[in-house]
């Protein structure tokens, strides 16, 4: 009877048997923690007794004499409900790791089913959401494997059967095949866990999670947790790990799932898609400029500053200022006297022999200036076949004043006289004319080149800058100032100053004509000397007073030769001697008339005094 109770399959009957049967059969086979074993339900049908022979029972007793400590530890975790707490910890840790993202917004750890291949190129969700896991969460159960795990073969079979019915659906064939492998089976088939995760994801999509039975939810929960903990680091694992895992599984995959040999290209494709996605996210995070100069031409000031066009424009003005500042006479004195010492002299870079002048005397250029090739090309294009602006004349020598070129500049400011003495030779006058003419042509070509450059720039960029001609005009009239090589604009316009400058320039032009006519005469009379000195003094004083009133920095402006051209025009165009004699006669007549008027006034005053007396 005790033997029948022993083979009945009820652990409660074995424990409730009489003491002799219990001492003989049950005591040596008791587990470490018997009070924590879950009792079977009384309504459950027991399994038939084991059909193994006496040799099998002796082998089981032999195994139980030397129990494996790892197997007892797993049994302890299962029976004492420690796995429930471990599952909760793993679940929360997995949720937190899955929620972490990098700075680019990409998940730090991507949990994904490696077996599932989405159709149509769509990627499945990485893992079920937290709400789905909690909805399917019931008390987890652990399938520890085949019979012979526990002291009583019948009770272990019944316990394993109940756990298989509750959580491991469709795994009887695998459990029955594991009887000869030992007391504890190896790790569960990963393919089954992956299938359960796939089913859980499908239930989440279709919304059928609430209609499932309790036993199915138990299996889904445990399998999904096992798959989550095993695949939460798939982003860092190599591809061979998945292929080896799938190759070691003994189960046959479904028809819709790919074969284990096809997993390698699939994972390579997924890695490629991840790289493309990361590259696209990096492109979106780049800081593009706020505007494009080609599409928004009204914001091209930044474009000019970035391409260093402002220094190029400023260098044009600086070169003109340096050239005017470094101009010297033959005797070494500066052409434009100023309180500042010239900082740069123009080096003579070679000159071709000068052609004979109107008087037949050849004159070499003392300090020629060479223009850049670009400037020469622009001059050829602008001035065409003009004899006064040819590249050879501008680049290598000074050109004497001709009536054709003098007619182009009608209203120019007179150049200040180098010396007020009447002993200045005819040679120095010619040199003065040549130098003034050359500098005037250089300034005019610079203005034309700058104006065309601004015109082309306004067409390309779509905005109008300040015309250089207006700036130079304001510089000549004193409305703007040049400090060093930079132009400082002034917002105030003085009309009175403008009129005064124009009147002074007109007087100086008339005085320069008188002084030129006096210098051209070869035999001046004694009576003409006072008048000539007076005319030269009048010509010198307005120029000096006007020149000294201006700031020293404005005296170096590139507009000065353009304004002083009228004086050169008067001095350069030497009239015939007959015309000079006529001018001298007119001057004599005017002087005599003035003397007669003075004598008449004195006589009238004397007569009035006598009458009064």
Swiss-Prot record:
Biased composition, class Polar residues, residue ranges: 51-60, 512-539
InterPro entries in alphabetical order: DUF4702
Segments for region (Disordered): 41-68, 329-395, 509-541, 565-613
Localization of this protein: Cytoplasm, Cytoskeleton, Microtubule organizing center, Centrosome
Extent of Basic and acidic residues compositional bias: 577-589
Acidic residues compositional bias, start-end: 590-613
Main location: cytoplasm
Taxonomic source organism: Homo sapiens
Phosphoserine sites (modified residues): 386
Residues forming coiled coils: 79-104
GO annotations of cellular component type: centrosome; cytoplasm
Record protein name field: Coiled-coil domain-containing protein 116
UniProt entry keywords in alphabetical sequence: Coiled coil, Cytoplasm, Cytoskeleton, Phosphoprotein
């Amino acid at each position: 009877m005790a033997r029948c109770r022993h083979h009945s399959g009820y652990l409660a009957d074995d424990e409730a048997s009489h003491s002799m049967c219990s001492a003989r059969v049950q005591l040596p086979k008791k587990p470490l923690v018997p009070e924590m074993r879950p009792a079977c339900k009384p309504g459950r049908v027991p399994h038939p007794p084991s059909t193994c022979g006496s040799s099998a029972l002796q082998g089981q007793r032999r195994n139980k004499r030397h129990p494996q400590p790892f197997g007892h530890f797993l049994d302890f975790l299962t029976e004492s409900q420690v796995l429930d707490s471990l599952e909760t910890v793993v679940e929360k840790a997995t949720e937190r790791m899955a929620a972490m993202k990098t700075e680019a917004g990409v998940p730090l750890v991507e949990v994904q089913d490696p077996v599932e291949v989405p159709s149509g190129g769509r990627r499945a969700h990485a893992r079920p959401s937290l709400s789905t896991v909690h909805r399917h969460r019931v008390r987890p159960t652990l399938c520890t494997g085949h019979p012979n795990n526990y002291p009583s073969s019948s009770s272990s079979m019944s316990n394993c059967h109940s756990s298989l019915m509750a959580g491991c659906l469709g795994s009887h064939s695998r459990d029955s095949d594991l009887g000869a492998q030992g007391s504890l089976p190896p790790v569960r088939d990963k393919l089954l866990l992956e299938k359960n995760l796939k089913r859980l994801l499908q239930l989440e999509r279709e919304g059928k999670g609430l209609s499932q039975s309790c036993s199915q939810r138990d299996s889904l929960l445990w399998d999904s947790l096992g798959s989550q903990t095993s695949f939460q680091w798939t982003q860092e694992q190599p591809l061979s790990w998945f292929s080896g895992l799938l190759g070691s599984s003994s189960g046959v995959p479904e028809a819709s799932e790919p074969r284990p040999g096809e997993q390698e290209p699939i994972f390579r494709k997924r890695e490629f898609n991840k790289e493309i996605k990361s590259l696209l996210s990096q492109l979106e995070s780049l800081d593009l400029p706020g505007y494009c100069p080609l599409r928004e031409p009204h914001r091209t000031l930044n474009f000019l500053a970035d391409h260093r066009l402002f220094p190029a424009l400023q260098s044009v003005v600086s070169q003109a200022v340096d050239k005017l500042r470094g101009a010297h006479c033959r005797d070494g004195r500066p052409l434009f006297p100023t309180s500042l010492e010239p900082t740069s002299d123009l080096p003579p870079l070679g000159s071709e022999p000068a052609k004979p002048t109107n008087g037949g005397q050849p004159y070499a250029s003392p300090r020629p200036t060479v223009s850049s090739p670009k400037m020469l090309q622009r001059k050829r294009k602008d001035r065409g076949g003009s004899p006064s602006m040819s590249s050879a004349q501008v680049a290598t020598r000074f050109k004497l004043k001709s009536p054709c070129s003098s007619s182009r500049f009608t209203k120019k400011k007179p150049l200040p006289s180098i010396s007020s003495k009447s002993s200045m030779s005819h040679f120095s006058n010619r040199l003065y004319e040549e130098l003034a003419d050359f500098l005037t042509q250089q300034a005019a070509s610079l203005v034309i080149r700058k104006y065309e450059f601004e015109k082309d720039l306004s067409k390309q960029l779509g905005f109008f800058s300040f015309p250089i001609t207006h700036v130079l005009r304001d510089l000549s009239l004193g409305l703007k100032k040049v400090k060093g090589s930079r132009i400082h604009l002034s917002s105030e316009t003085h009309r009175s100053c403008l009129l005064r400058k124009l009147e002074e320039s007109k007087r100086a032009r008339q005085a320069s004509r008188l002084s030129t006519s006096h210098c051209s005469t070869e035999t001046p009379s004694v009576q003409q000397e006072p008048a000539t000195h007076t005319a030269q003094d009048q010509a010198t004083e307005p120029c000096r007073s006007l020149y000294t009133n201006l700031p020293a920095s404005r005296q170096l402006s590139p507009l000065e030769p353009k304004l002083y051209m009228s004086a050169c025009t008067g001095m350069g165009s030497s009239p015939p001697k007959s015309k000079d004699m006529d001018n001298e006669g007119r001057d004599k007549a005017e002087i005599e008339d003035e003397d007669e008027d003075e004598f008449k006034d004195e006589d009238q005053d004397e007569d009035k005094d006598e009458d009064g007396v």
